[in-house]
Structure formats: C-alpha cells, structure tokens
C-alpha cells in the first residue's frame, strides 16, 4: 500500500471535495477506490512507459480535455480548481501537478467523473463497490487489461480490508533480517580486511 488510507481520505480527498462543494461519502469512496485500483493508493506515481500520472494515473491528454472542453464552460469551478494548483509551475509544467499535487490531482479525477454526469453517488450506494467498479470502468478506466473485478479486488484489499492508519507498504518479497548485521569493524563482521566479506493504452 502507498499512502495511509485514513490520511488520504481525511487530509486530501474530503477537503478537496468540500472545497469544490461536491463532497458526499459515495464520491469520496469512489475516488479512494479509483486511487486503489490505479496506483495502489500512490504506491506507483508513474508506471513504466504508461502515460498515466499520479495516484489516479490520469493521462495528459485527459487532463487537457478537462480544461479545454469541460472547465471552459464553468469559469467559477475552473477558478476553484486553478486555485489548487501551483502558482508558477502549473504554467510551465501543468501535467506535473498530477504527480506532485494530491489535492489538484483529486480535483481532476473528480472532474473526469463529473464530466460524465457522475456528480454524486446516492447515500444508499456509498458502499456499493459493484456500482463504483462500473462507474470507474465506464468513465475513468483507459486501458484494456483491468476489469470491474480488478477494481472490486483492489477496493476490498486496500480500502475495505485495510487498516486505515497503516502507511507501511505491504511488500511480500524478501524479509529484513531479524537482527541487523554487526558493524564493519566489530569482531566477526569480516570488516574491510575480512575473508567473508532494485488513457490511450500505455
């Protein structure tokens, strides 16, 4: 897992949606699920040669479309979103905000859903993971490989079944030794003179 679940929810997603006057629990959960599926809650910010960026893996062309074809019709909303971005860097490197600015990236992720007429999720469906998976796959997903089942599995593992205060990455590879190695110059360590000296489809 990447970012602490509770902190991502309470310090990033919720205040961003509140700033945009768009908060409801269902949308908050949908964005958490989107981050879980796209980047394992921020474990990956740029995956190999894929074009997606940040915790939501938003593609640059999608980012441009939101500004050029959607926000252009909503000046007050555009002003609120622009206020979340860096004052100067945004003008020179707008797409880098998707990686470095969590609240801005969250606003753009929400706008991707909003531009598809997904404004809010009913309170009764706030925990409906099947519905969220369908919304993600229909309006957000930009590659052919992942499925709604993948979204549901990511949500179950990283959102529903996660310790919300756990910020440690869950790595199943080689484990650290139970005892740290002895200092180089201590007896038996070998030392320097001893003998026993890692959106279009990407």
PLM ranges: what are they?
Residues 148-184, 190:
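Long, charge-rich low-complexity segments
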Residues 1-42:
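Export/targeting segments at the very N-terminus of extracytoplasmic proteins
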Residues 182-202:
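Long, low-complexity, intrinsically disordered segments
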Residues 88-111:
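Alpha-helix-centered segments that form part of catalytic cores
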Residues 50-88:
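Substrate-binding/active-site groove segments that recognize
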Residues 65-68, 89, 93, 113-129:
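Substrate-binding/catalytic groove segments of enzymes
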Residues 16-20, 38-39, 45, 112-117, ...:
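Sec/Tat-exported extracytoplasmic proteins
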Residues 35-39, 120-146:
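Acidic helix/loop microenvironments that form the catalytic cleft of cell-wall polysaccharide enzymes
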């Amino acid at each position: 897992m990447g970012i602490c679940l509770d902190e991502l929810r309470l310090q990033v997603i919720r205040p961003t949606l509140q700033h945009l006057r768009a908060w409801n629990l269902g949308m908050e959960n949908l964005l958490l699920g989107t981050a879980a599926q796209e980047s394992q809650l921020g474990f990956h910010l740029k995956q190999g040669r894929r074009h997606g960026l940040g915790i939501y893996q938003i593609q640059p062309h999608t980012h441009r479309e939101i500004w050029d074809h959607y926000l252009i019709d909503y000046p007050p909303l555009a002003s609120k979103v622009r206020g979340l971005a860096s004052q100067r860097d945004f003008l020179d490197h707008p797409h880098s905000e998707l990686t470095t600015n969590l609240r801005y990236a969250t606003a753009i992720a929400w706008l991707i859903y909003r531009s598809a007429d997904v404004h809010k999720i009913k309170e009764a469906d706030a925990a409906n993971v099947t519905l969220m998976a369908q919304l993600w796959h229909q309006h957000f997903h930009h590659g052919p490989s992942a499925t709604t089942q993948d979204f549901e599995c990511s949500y179950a593992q990283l959102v529903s079944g996660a310790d919300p205060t756990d910020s440690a990455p869950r790595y199943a590879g080689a484990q650290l030794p139970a005892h740290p190695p002895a200092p180089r110059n201590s007896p038996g360590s070998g030392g320097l003179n001893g003998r026993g000296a890692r959106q279009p489809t990407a």
